[in-house]
Amino acid sequence: MKRSKELITKNHSQEETSILRCWKCRKCIASSGCFMEYFENQVIKDKDDSVDAQNICHVWHMNIESLPEWISCLIQKAQWTVGKLNCPFCGARLGGFNFVSTPKCSCGQLAAVHLSKSRTDYQPTQAGRLMRPSVKYLSHPRVQSGCDKEVLLTGGGSKNRNHRLLNMARNNNDPGRLTEALCLEVRPTYFEMKNEKLLSKASEPKYQLFVPQLVTGRCTTRAFHRKSHSLDLNISEKLTLLPTLYEIRGKTTAYSRLNETQPIDLSGLPLQSSKNSCSFQNPSSFDPGMLLQRFSVAPHETQTQRGGEFQCGLEAASVYSDHTNTNNLTFLMDLPSAGRSMPEASDQEEHLSPLDFLHSANFSLGSINQRLNKRERSKLKNLRRKQRRRERWLQKQGKYSGVGFLDHMTLNNEMSTDEDNEYAEEKDSYICAVCLDVYFNPYMCYPCRHIFCEPCLRTLAKDNPSSTPCPLCRTIISRVFFQTELNNATKTFFTKEYLKIKQSFQKSNSAKWPLPSCRKAFHLFGGFHRHAAPVTRRQFPHGAHRMDYLHFEDDSRGWWFDMDMVIIYIYSVNWVIGFIVFCFLCYFFFPF
């Protein structure tokens, strides 16, 4: 009690922590710790109306040694030359950097890295007024603390700040609102408190601190919040609530999100509460692998039933700061046991780069801010397809081991699906373009060389067999040739379909119709026409043994000399009979 009184009476002044927000999306892009040392004097000059307009600085001068992570990435990408600074959330222009020829500002300072004041909003915020985001979208770290010995998540910080926070928490008697510092998406939440104070340790004012307002006595506080679609923690947006994206230099002990549809029982939590103190227990063991697994698995069951109100106990999650000697922004995760003291924890804490953390979770910065485009999705599909083919090949060879029962069933299903796809692709090469069915007695048409099945050709040549156009290119079909190899392949691969078409063709009248051919009458002595009988057409159904293609292909009358036709007709029976008749007539009219 004596120490508490000293804390209450000591230093009532509250130190301010300022942040910059994007003028377009209102997201936090930098804190006061990223500016030069003369930042406070610069703000005072800007507020003074009597200052000359020429001496007013219109940019925020950034400290190169403590730049935010997103600015450092842009500078390294530009290889420390010249570039623009765009908002990492909405892409709006915020400022720029120039290390080639460093310009000077109107205030006389170098503007190597600067943010424009007209494109950013300066917000001085009381350290005690900054609230943490919704408890539903943060992890649930538990810390062991007491009045005599403070064991906190933060790796460092001043004790005066802790005393000031305790003083503000005890003097806050009216029901407060659990507001947000980063406009996270939250829903109305009820929580009961039996505590009067919460011991926490904060860092320098340049880092963000989220402190829930405490209410003395037993009361129920309802928090109404605005909805923002920017930083919702779910799987589809790839863990956008990472502290590294908001310039929070600290270490966080994260836990999986609790189920939103079930009330939270405080009896299961190692929470110790009394009238004068509120302490949180730190688990004795923690697996960082389970952290990533819970981050990626837990929200699947809860994101479909969001928006409901539920009763919960006091959920505390704090984001703390840490002093780092490095220039780049680091993400510190503290994994000490409950029995370890603060110096031991600070000596053995793990330093993880934000990029290493994202790569370890199989995420990329591009996938956090936007979804995969079509090209990336097609690449992923191709990789999965190649992997499935390799697994099938190894399974056929008997070398694929280590596959469980479910994986085996999945592989079998994928194999059957791929086999069906391959079967469909093979069947496409044996389908007629007219009837859209497999070939039955296919014929190749000349001169266009398109292939169609016999029922389709006979149907097309029903009305005009001598000038039948090709159904694809509209070329007049002069002759057709039967394709034996294609017919045998169709009969072998698609036996059922082939037999079904054969039966329907034999039962239909199309079997009596002619095939298309430019069979013109051979004009003999200018008037006698030679026509082929339908019986002859049925005797040679496949056309490979007929000589129909040797007929004339024009409408000329009388004799049209062709040596091939002469030779053929000399050996024909008609000429033999004609020669005998000619000899008989000569003997009858011209006797010797």
UniProtKB/Swiss-Prot annotation:
One of its GO terms (molecular function) is ubiquitin conjugating enzyme binding. The chain crosses the membrane at residues 565-585. Residues 586-592 are extracellular. Pathway: Protein modification; protein ubiquitination. GO terms for biological process: adult behavior; norepinephrine metabolic process; positive regulation of proteasomal ubiquitin-dependent protein catabolic process; positive regulation of protein ubiquitination; protein polyubiquitination; serotonin metabolic process. It is an enzyme of class 2 (transferase). Coiled coil: none annotated. It is a single-pass membrane protein. Its main location: endoplasmic reticulum. It is found in: Endoplasmic reticulum membrane; Nucleus envelope. This is E3 ubiquitin-protein ligase RNF180. It comes from Pongo abelii. The gene is RNF180.
